[in-house]
């Protein structure tokens, strides 16, 4: 219960889904946690549920002004960030021929540009031996129609993680990526489907998962805990898929 005792973690997009579940687990393991989110009401509600060792910052990962000012806001709370989980992301989908420049930019701005410059901005606060986690997707390896811009943005994240692992190895900062498969998170409610179509889509996806269920946010959080802690001290540049075996099927 004390794998992160004395550590401070920053989790972007920590007010819901995977980010919130990870914040809860990190707190259980002794960390102080700073979450970010773009909606003040959602961040406030999350902080109230997390307790006194959690802090919130209103910050939109797709807004470069917010990304640039985030390090200063973090420094008002802590001088050091032992763990950074660049988790904030969006999933905006359309057939390739119907993908607008706005949809393309929205995916890339949040999922890659925001991640890139969030890590760059907070890196001076990360001590030698720190841990950086990035959130990618199994869709990088297995194509799915309508996800071209989204999958490309997450593929860039995965490439970033491998590069940073080499660049930061001299400081013993480990950089690893998590690639979730079908996880029950609020992102599915933002796909623009009617409730009936969403249920049909979910059933079709679940049928293709060897473990025959959607994952829960806590399933991903457990992997984040492993990668953030000393339990994974000899892992860097790695990708861990959390997908119930989905990426191993034809």
Label every PLM stretch briefly.
Residues 8, 15-16:
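Conserved glycine-rich cofactor-binding loop
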Residues 40, 158, 175, 180-190:
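Short, flexible catalytic-loop segment of classical short-chain dehydrogenase/reductase
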Residues 95-96, 100-108, 205:
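Substrate-binding pocket helix/loop in short-chain dehydrogenase/reductase
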Residues 96-97, 129, 142-148, 170, ...:
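Active-site loop immediately N-terminal to the catalytic Tyr-X3-Lys motif
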Residues 119, 153, 161:
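Active-site helix of classical SDR
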Residues 124-125, 166-170, 233:
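Alpha-helical segment proximal to the catalytic Tyr-Lys
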Residues 142, 225, 236-250:
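Short C-terminal tail/terminal secondary-structure segment
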């Amino acid at each position: 219960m004390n794998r992160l005792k004395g550590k401070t973690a920053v989790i972007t997009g920590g007010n819901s889904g995977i980010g919130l579940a990870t914040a809860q687990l990190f707190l259980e393991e002794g960390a102080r946690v700073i979450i970010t989110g773009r909606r003040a009401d959602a961040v406030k509600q999350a902080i109230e549920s997390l307790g006194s060792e959690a802090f919130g910052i209103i910050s939109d990962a797709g807004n470069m002004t917010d990304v640039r000012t985030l390090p200063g806001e973090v420094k008002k709370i802590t001088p050091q960030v032992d763990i950074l989980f660049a988790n904030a992301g969006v999933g905006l989908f359309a057939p390739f021929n119907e993908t607008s420049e706005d949809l393309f930019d929205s995916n890339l701005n949040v999922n890659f540009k925001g991640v890139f410059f969030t890590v760059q901005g907070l890196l001076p606060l990360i001590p030698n031996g720190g841990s950086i986690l990035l959130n990618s997707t199994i869709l990088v390896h297995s194509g799915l129609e309508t996800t071209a811009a989204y999958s490309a943005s997450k593929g860039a994240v995965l490439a970033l993680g491998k590069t940073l692992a080499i660049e930061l190895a001299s400081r013993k900062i480990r950089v690893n990526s998590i690639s979730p498969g079908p996880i029950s998170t609020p992102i599915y409610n933002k796909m623009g489907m009617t409730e009936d179509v969403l249920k049909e889509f979910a059933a079709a996806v679940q049928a293709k998962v060897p473990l025959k269920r959607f994952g829960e946010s806590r399933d991903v959080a457990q992997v984040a805990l492993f990668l953030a802690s000393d339990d994974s001290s000899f892992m860097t540049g790695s990708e861990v898929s959390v997908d119930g075996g989905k990426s191993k099927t034809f």
